[in-house]
């Protein structure tokens, strides 16, 4: 085979490999985007769980997801309490009006704001935004891993904050935002369609269609 022929063959192979790589990369990117959106749209609150345990590696993934949340000035004003003890889970369920399902969960994650980490020059309440973002990350991560979870509110209710602090021995500079029971779903409720165009305003209040 002439040198020019060999060169043409090699060039054709190289172009083919490049095309395949680009296609695979584009497919992966599209799949990733679709997976993220699908995960958001199909997540729903799960309040009933099987007896299957959540292993340590899966738990760490949830906590890493929480800590990957956006945070003002990178304060990271959060702490996370993991509760597996059955007596403590029962006590949380007994103490909080909307967290009864915690008694049947393999574990709960208590998302807390740390007032000593929250910088007053940013905002005395910026921890609320940061820990809320962390909570949503945990909920989405749980759903993506085949787990079920639900956000049960603690802050800003003084009696609930006091109850959680008492059960878990939490100091006064730590404010529990919420308790997230986590486990493998024993129910499959359909996600609610919450899309309402009337809640969107374009350029001026009350304009619900983009011109």
What are these regions (language model features)?
Residues 2-211:
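Acidic, surface-exposed loops and disordered segments
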């Amino acid at each position: 085979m002439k040198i020019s022929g060999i060169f043409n063959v090699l060039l054709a192979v190289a172009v083919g490999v490049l095309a395949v790589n680009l296609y695979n990369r584009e497919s992966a990117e599209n799949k990733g985007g679709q997976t993220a959106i699908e995960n958001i749209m199909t997540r729903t609150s799960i309040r009933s769980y099987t007896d299957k345990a959540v292993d340590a590696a899966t738990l760490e993934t949830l906590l890493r997801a929480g800590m990957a949340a956006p945070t003002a000035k990178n304060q990271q004003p959060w702490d996370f309490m993991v509760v597996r003890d059955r007596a403590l889970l029962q006590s949380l369920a007994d103490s909080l009006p909307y967290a009864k399902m915690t008694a049947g969960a393999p574990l709960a994650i208590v998302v807390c704001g740390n007032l000593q980490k929250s910088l007053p020059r940013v905002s005395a309440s910026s921890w609320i935004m940061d820990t809320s973002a962390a909570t949503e990350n945990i909920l989405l991560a749980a759903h993506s891993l085949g787990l079920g979870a639900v956000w049960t509110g603690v802050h800003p209710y003084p009696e609930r904050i006091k109850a959680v602090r008492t059960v878990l021995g939490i100091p006064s500079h730590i404010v529990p935002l919420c308790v997230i029971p986590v486990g493998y779903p024993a129910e499959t409720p359909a996600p609610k369609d919450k899309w309402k165009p009337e809640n969107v305003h374009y350029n001026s209040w009350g304009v619900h269609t983009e011109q």
